[in-house]
Amino acid sequence: MKKLGLLLFPLLAITLMLGGNAFAQDNSTYFTTYYSNANTSGAPDATLRIINDGNTDANLYADIYVFDDSQELQACCGCVISADGLLSESVNKNLTADPITGIKPQRGVIKVISSQSSDPTVISQFPGLREWSTHVQKLTSGYAMTETLAADSNLAPSEADLLSMLCSFDELLSGHPCTCTQEDQDF
């Protein structure tokens, strides 16, 4: 019995050490959120806010991919954010103003990759961005706004390849990417 305990103790210690490393890894490079009631008469505009946490003391890029509610890419762009900087993007004016289909979407999904590359067709994940967004909620009379932290998501290689490919097609077909506001300024 004592031999079994001596054998299991090192295995348990190794498991805990390796498991601790897995928990310490930073997977905050891919974020997802939604938008609703965009480009809707009488509804307020929603905002996507992204900060560079300054941990790397370097510029990072928010590679942004905007989908409609039919899961079709409508726009993509790469926006620079300096260390400790803030990027504020209007859903109506920056992200859905010039969609590839020509029809401004009212709801859909926004995906953001924290990247070292300004080109959203080149996936170069690098942690350091954080994202929040406001959401326009329809009420019986009028609209209400809520704000949430974007979901910290897992970016599979197949999803990264798909985003890169779709954005390449968007650039080839429309030539009109979403636009970036100047950092630390609202639209």
Language-model segments: what does each one mean?
Residues 1-9:
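Bacterial N-terminal signal peptides that target proteins for export
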Residues 22-187:
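Gly/Pro-rich, tryptophan- and cysteine-flecked surface segments typical
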